Amino acid sequence: MRITTVNPYSQEKLGEYEEYDDNRLNGILSGLKEAQREWEKDIDRRIDYFRSVLKPNLSKRRNELAKLITEEMGKPITQSLSEIDKCIKLVDYAINDYPHYLEPQTIKTEGKKTYVRFDPLGTVLLIMPWNFPLWQVMRGAVPAMLAGNAIVLKHASIVTGTSLMIEEIFSSELFRSVIVSGSRVGKLIQKVEGVSLTGSSGAGKSVAQEAGKHLKKVVLELGGSDPFIVLKSANVHEASENAVFARMQNNGQSCIASKRFIVHEDIFEEFADEIAGKFANVKVGDPLDKSTFLGPLSSMDQTKTVRSQIENLSGMGKVSSFGQYSGGIVPPTIAQISGKFEEEVFGPVAILTRFRTDQEAIALANDTPFGLGASIWGHSDEAERIVPEIEAGMVFVNKIVTSDPRVPFGGVKQSGIGRELSKFGTREFTNIKTVWIDH
């Protein structure tokens, strides 16, 4: 099977790649397992690798990789560069902070010595999406490799070139990218010790089912339909300013993008007017132009899906689009509705609805199968009081939801299982081993 990558803005063909056959895959997996046996023995070696190999390689190839990311999946070039810079910061955390999370933890008991150690599992399969093609990989690979695991990456086919460049940047016998179709992922799952998937809820269920057959450890970071709650006490100007990036970052294709804007009725019109004015002034166009804020969606299939969702929203309320459809570009769009819309819209579409009471806002926020992130805007004490009632893995007050190496990332409900980053993510792909020495 041949895989072809296409520029979603120009529709030009970028490259063609051959799928790896079973012999090549088996050779790669055997090499990873052999290398991992030595890798797990020395954390100082692992830290030195991040410091002397991975970080310099990311910096050296920053511009080249950013351009390829933008060409393959349409992200504005300024955001591609920012994504790489964020990955470099993650490596710094892996060098300076994450090793402490892997130190044995002493527990006081009646025995002579009792402690918990964190041993690697072996080889971890990363099944990654196209929307943040470097950050998603780094978020999974760096903590797992620091813990002593090897990594095999199965990336989304539309970013195959990026996947191979990432392998070059890692430049390690502990990290390999493979080109395989989705139908063959099951065979890979059988041959590794852990699986981390970022993708849709449907993909997560399929991978969890396959992993369950073989009792493989899984971490699933899945879809989201994050609420952006604007309380009566909110600074409307601040909230609307942040709403633009919260909804349209990465051309609206982010699992943690704010998608449902739940606004107090007393300030609803003011907020709606402000966000409409800002949406109307967004620079749309060539993602390689540094002044562009909104580029094309990742593929024509994705464009068709979002356009269909906008048509469905038109039957539920007032829909306003600010610009023209052109190729893969979907213009900034606002839908004011009174009912609920359960689908995750992976494009620059803001769904606005109003509420009267805090309990109504909470009910609207939770009325979704997803539970990834949520942001609340208003007086911090008032906002914090409703945090426990929000069904989400992450709640940010007066800040848009983001992934940060210092805090755990992940969701509940249909948004996933497990956590990435921080102490919790670093330990996900470890054998948490109890050691009790009685005398």
Regions found by a protein language model. Give the residues of each.
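Structural signal for hydrophobic packing residues in well-ordered secondary-structure cores
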Residues: Q36-E40, L58-R62, A66, M73, ...
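ALDH superfamily catalytic-core signature
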Residues: M1, L14, G194, G202-I337, ...
